[in-house]
Regions:
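N-terminal loops that bind phosphate or other acidic moieties
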Residues: 1-240
């Protein structure tokens, strides 16, 4: 029997690559033919399963400190894992986070670097974020966004949550108090109005726009396509 092992990570325990390797070894030991196909849904591990990093650049972390963020570019295609620039782990977890101040600016810097380096297709995995800024930080780093015309910006989402709901659903996991959740909810609601007024995109109606604290919705407002992270990775690695 031939088995394709397509496992995602066990968060906090083992990476997708480690898990698939262990399962393949066990199957081979049992006399089966097994092939490893590590998977990701757009969250942590997205970069690793799509070839791994071949560049590292210094960008702005979620709370303003500089961080070294790995990413990948090959043949005009860039792969960015937002957690590498704006992730909760970068600030030491929810207890050390400032959920109101946390910004996606560094993720925007990575996207900008990718395009400046020749990428015409940019895959952004969103998940594991420290942020609930609705993507406004990233958009500030990308300004002026007109220079990204002709670039395919694709956001791999790991949730279906809509934009304004991101605060209520995920902000408590990032250290937000009930009062801060209410503040962040109101901020996202206002941002949705601003995005519609400025770009004509109704981000609140887009499934998955609440991913990474609304980063997905912010990027959608400038033309990004939001897709299922699992389906994107499956397509990219030829899992069929």
């Amino acid at each position: 029997m031939r088995v394709v092992v397509a496992s995602d990570k066990f968060k906090g325990t083992a990476s997708a690559r480690e898990l698939t390797a262990a399962i393949v070894d066990a199957l081979v030991d049992a006399g089966h033919d097994a092939v490893a196909a590590p998977m990701a849904d757009g969250g942590e591990g997205f970069l690793d399963v799509l070839g791994g990093a071949n560049r590292t650049d210094t960008v702005t972390g979620p709370l303003g400190d500089l961080v070294d963020a790995p990413w990948r570019i090959s043949r005009g295609v860039a792969v960015i894992e937002m957690a590498a620039a704006s992730g909760l782990m970068l600030v030491g977890g929810s207890d050390e986070n400032d959920p109101v101040a946390a910004s996606t600016y560094g993720t925007g810097e990575l996207i900008s670097l990718a395009v400046e380096s020749g990428a015409r297709r940019v895959l952004v995995g969103v998940g594991g974020s420290a942020t609930t800024d609705g993507g406004i930080g990233a958009l500030r780093a990308l300004h002026p966004t007109q220079r990204f015309r002709g670039v395919d910006l694709i956001v791999a989402c790991d949730v279906r949550t809509r934009f304004v709901d991101a605060a209520d659903v995920f902000a408590p996991q990032k250290g937000a108090t009930p009062a801060q959740v209410k503040l962040l909810h109101g901020r996202l609601k206002r941002l949705a109005q601003v995005y519609e007024e400025e770009t004509g995109v109704v981000v609140g109606n887009i499934e998955g726009s609440g991913a990474a604290g609304g980063l997905a919705g912010g990027l959608a407002s400038i033309g990004a396509e939001l897709v299922s992270g699992f389906e994107l990775v499956a397509d990219e690695i030829g899992l069929d």
